[in-house]
Structure formats: C-alpha cells, structure tokens
Amino acid sequence: QIAFAGGKLDAGDADAIAAALREAQEEIGLPPDHVSVIGQLEAHETVTGYQITPVLARLERRFDAVPEAGEVAEVFRVPLAFLLDAQNYRVEGRRWRGAWRKFYAVPWGPYYIWGATARILKALSDRVAE
C-alpha cells in the first residue's frame, strides 16, 4: 500500500498541520524546518471511515529520507508535473467487502498509487487546474 506520512492528532498537536509535520519527521525523518506549509486540502474520508486532512507543503531543502523501520518500507518521489496532469489518472474498480467500488489510480513506474492516496492527489490536480 502506498500512503503519505500521517496519523492521528496527538494530545500535543496544535492542529492537523502540526500533526502532519510531526508524523513526517517520525516516519521519514523530514525535519519540519525543511518545509514551508502551503495549506490544507479538503478533508477526505476513507472507505474504512478514517478522516484524512491532507497538508500541502513545499520542500525547501533537500534531505535524505530515513524510513521508520516497521512502518515505512520505502520512500520514492514522483514529479509534481506528472501528478498534476489529469491525463495520468484513471478510474478502476474492484470488489471489496461484497460491493463493487470504483477508485482513482495513478500508476508511476513500478508503483501503483490508488485509493485514498490517489484520490487526494487527484483533488490536488483538480484544484490546481481551476
């Protein structure tokens, strides 16, 4: 499964942005001072009922990702121009819990980005295109 760094708000988190910065540091070693937060995208609900508040930030300095063992198997990059091109998204479907579900997918090389992650990226693509 391909997903963004993230998790739930901890008691010490001021808001979703603080939680996102903390989780990115914990999961891939991204120092918070290496990014400039642009803002938040519209919240998304997963098919399993989780509420996701995507936080968009610009990487200001290069860093070497250090995946947290046991939680992150691999970190990879996809060019922003590829993700913003609506032509790269497709709608697919599969049976899940007895029902047929449709979802976005945006394959990149050997990686199959789909579900909530692809839906968030598609929402970003749509918003930039407005």
Outline where the language-model segments fall:
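Short, His- and charge-rich active-site/binding loops that engage polyanionic ligands
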Residues: Q1-L9
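Unchanged
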Residues: K8-G109, I113, K122-E130
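NAD(P)-dependent dehydrogenases' Rossmann-like dinucleotide-binding region
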Residues: T117
